[in-house]
């Protein structure tokens, strides 16, 4: 799956990472530059909806997104 990152640089939302998964796209919000994990994660139905929500909520424009290595905050649990 793919992941995308943008710097919002707003109070309480320094960075946003979109994480594509089978169930949809997680919008992971990081509070500041020292945050190691998101403090908010909102599930959107698809990438377009996630980007629209980020534009509305955090002012992130399409050109600000960059593809990054896949992240695993919501990776499926390994099967035993």
Model-inferred region functions:
Residues 17-18, 37-47, 77-78:
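Short amphipathic beta-strand/extended segments with alternating polar/hydrophobic composition
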Residues 2-5, 28-29, 51-52:
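Intrinsically disordered, low-complexity boundary segments flanking structured domains
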Residues 12-38:
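Short aromatic-glycine-(Arg/Gly/Cys) micro-motifs in beta-strand/loop hairpins
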Residues 39-61:
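A short, charged, amphipathic alpha-helix used as a generic interaction element across diverse proteins
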Residues 8-10, 19, 57-59:
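A generic structural signal for short, solvent-exposed coil/turn residues
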């Amino acid at each position: 799956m793919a992941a995308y990152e943008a710097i919002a640089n707003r109070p309480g939302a320094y960075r946003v990472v979109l994480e594509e998964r089978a169930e949809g796209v997680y919008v992971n919000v990081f509070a500041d530059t020292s945050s190691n994990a998101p403090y908010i994660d909102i599930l959107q139905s698809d990438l377009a909806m996630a980007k629209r929500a980020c534009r509305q909520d955090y002012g992130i424009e399409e050109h600000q997104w960059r593809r990054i290595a896949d992240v695993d905050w919501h990776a499926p649990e390994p099967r035993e």
